[in-house]
Each structure stands twice: as C-alpha cells, then as structure tokens.
Amino acid sequence: MKILIDENMPYAAELFSELGEVIAKSGRTLTADDLIDVDALMIRSVTKVNAELLSQANKLKFVGTATAGMDHVDQALLKEKGIFFTAAPGCNKVGVAEYVLSCLMVLAQQHGFSIFEKTFGIVGAGQVGSYLAQCLDALNISYLLNDPIKEQEGDSRSFVVLDELLEKSDVITLHTPITRDGEYPTHHLIGQKVLSKLRNDQILINAARGPVVDNQALKQRLLKQDGFKAVLDVFEFEPDVDMELLPLLSFATPHIAGYGLEGKARGTTMIFNSYCEFLKRSERADPQTLLPIAPIPNVRLNQQWDHSTLHNLIQLVYDVRKDDAVFRKEITTVGAFDKMRKDYWDRREYSAITITGTQCCDLTPLQQLGFTIEEV
C-alpha cells in the first residue's frame, strides 16, 4: 500500500509508515503522475485536489487534509469517484486565536491602547472564530459575531450583519473559508467598498484565506496613512506577495497563524486516525504523545495577575514580531514563502506553560485562556 504525504506534515512519516509505504513530496508541486499507484493521499492547504491532479490516480481511495479548511479540495469530485475524504476541523483553532491575541497585545503596547477597552468583530463563527470568542469571554472583552450561514442554520448565538460589525468594532478579525458562490460569498468580502468605510482607528486582521481581502484595495486604503492598521497572515496570491503592500502592514507572516506544534500534531493525528478507521485497523495516535517537552519555563504568580502580567505571559509563548521580522527579511528570496513554512520553528500553545499560584491569584481566566494551572 502506497501512502503519499506532504513532506512538511509533522509526524506523518513516522505514523503512516505503520500502515504502508510512505512517499513524501512537496505538496505545492504535486502532479498527476505522482498519484499513479497511490492508495492514499495526505495533504495540507497548499495542494489543490482537482480533476487535473486526480487524472492519473488509478488506485486512490482516501484523501486526508491535515487542515481545518477544505476549500482546496473538490469534495464533489472525490465523492463522484468514490474516494473517501476527511479533514481536521478545529486542529489549528488554538494557534490562530493565540496569533490574533499576540498581534493585538503588541499593537496595544506600541500604540498605547488597551485591548480590554476594544470591541472585537469576529467574521466567521466556525471552529476558529468560536474559539477566539471563548478566549475573549475569558478576558471579559466585548465582541460581535457575524456568520449569516450559521445564523440561518439556527445557531443560538447572537449575530449581527456585517455592516453593523464593521461600524461598531475596533478590531475586525476574519475567520471564514473562501467561497465564490452561494448567497454569502467570501471572495473579496473585504473589498474597496468596505475598506473605504473603515475608520482610521480600526485594525483589520486576516488569518483566514488570502482572497477574502482584496489586496489591491487594501494597499490603496493603507496608502492613506491615516492610522488604519492591517495584519496579514495570508495573501491573495500566495506564495506571491505584493512587495508594495508589505511595508504598509503592521505585521505580515507566511500563513503560519495556525502553525503551532500542537495544532500540526492534531491535524496529522486526526487524519491518521481517520485512515485507520477507514482501513478497519486498530492503531490510534494521540497528539500529546508526539510532542516534545516545551522549552518554556513554568511561571509562579505570587499576587493577582494584571494586564501587564497577561501581556508578558502571551509574549512568552508567542511574540508575532519574531515571525514578522523573519518574513520581511527573507521574502525576497526565491521560494522563501514555502521555505519559511517548511522550516517553521516549534511554536507552542499556552497550554505548554504551567502557571502556579494561590487561589487569591484568580487563575480561572488564565485556565480558560488555555494555560495549564496548578494551585498551591
């Protein structure tokens, strides 16, 4: 049995080698010929699964994507061909939410505002948007939700229309898939018309899919230099990056918001376990058993934590400025976008830090945020 995996999928080679012959290749450059005699294909979001790629897939029975997003896969085509498909919904939700919080903490420090006084506008209330809302609840930060599809489906949460969210939010953070059809397409959801309405004190963050934001329109908006700020982890035509847009961004990173080590381990193990079920095999993987010990110290609190403490804890785990600096330095090199993703450092989640303190420290909000807590 031949299993073709993306070479940049952590832990995949060691796990899938238990089930058959593993072939590792670059996910972005896969061709139809690569799928000849392949039984299973394990990918990430850089691989477009379409008719062209599958044209020589004479034995393919299973496709798994170790990502939460699925818009890179033609699911209708797989169903038509009788090929089983699975994804890893929610695998990266923690990493993306922590990325957003890191960006806001640094911007708050740089520009002298408090995120606790801001209203967040979360566009897309799926796995990632919902987890970010959970984090904001833990910190008692106000937010608005926009997701017309979930609202139509009867989701009991309180939603607002996009125009209201754009008007009332200080921070607009995008967590939608990319869709071009249907009643609520997200392609260029944030285009020239929307951008022209945004205030100069607002912040836009896109850690969803690049084409959700019209990058040319965003560039023109930022060229006004009136205080409006934008953070992009994804780009409309990635791996190509508009080098005129880049210096206008507050932070820019190569599609790594959800690239925490825990998230990647979750994604790989989720599709591994699904493939084992498909094969009726008994093997199962637990992401926690794959993770190395985090090189992050335990933290002891001797008094009630405050906003400054929280800022320090968040930056101890992940400081977006590190990735931003590397991105700006390396992006002009040929192939840099994918290389930075391939060589990405072992970033951890809040859960990798154990915070020790007494009951008087009120550690519950930190626990709800994801930190590991020990009361003494």
Swiss-Prot record:
UniProt cross-references to InterPro entries, sorted A to Z: D-isomer_2-hydroxyacid_DH, D-isomer_2_OHA_DH_cat_dom, D-isomer_DH_CS, D-isomer_DH_NAD-bd, Erythronate-4-P_DHase, Erythronate-4-P_DHase_dimer, NAD(P)-bd_dom_sf, PdxB_dimer_sf
Residue sites binding substrate per the record: 45, 67, 259
GO-annotated molecular function: 4-phosphoerythronate dehydrogenase activity; glyoxylate reductase (NADPH) activity; hydroxypyruvate reductase [NAD(P)H] activity; NAD binding; protein dimerization activity
CDD domains the record matches: ErythrP_dh
Keyword Amino-acid biosynthesis set for record: no
Binding positions (NAD(+)): 127-128, 147, 176, 233, 258
Top-level lineage group: Bacteria
Active-site residues, as the UniProt record annotates them: 209, 238, 255
EC primary class: oxidoreductase
Repeat among keywords: no
GO biological process: pyridoxine biosynthetic process
Location within or outside the cell: Cytoplasm
Family (UniProt): Belongs to the D-isomer specific 2-hydroxyacid dehydrogenase family. PdxB subfamily.
PANTHER family tied to this protein: 2-HYDROXYACID DEHYDROGENASE YGL185C-RELATED, 2-HYDROXYACID DEHYDROGENASE-RELATED
Assembly notes: Homodimer.
Purpose: Catalyzes the oxidation of erythronate-4-phosphate to 3-hydroxy-2-oxo-4-phosphonooxybutanoate.
Protein name: Erythronate-4-phosphate dehydrogenase
Source organism: Aliivibrio fischeri (strain MJ11) (Vibrio fischeri)
Gene name tied to this protein: pdxB
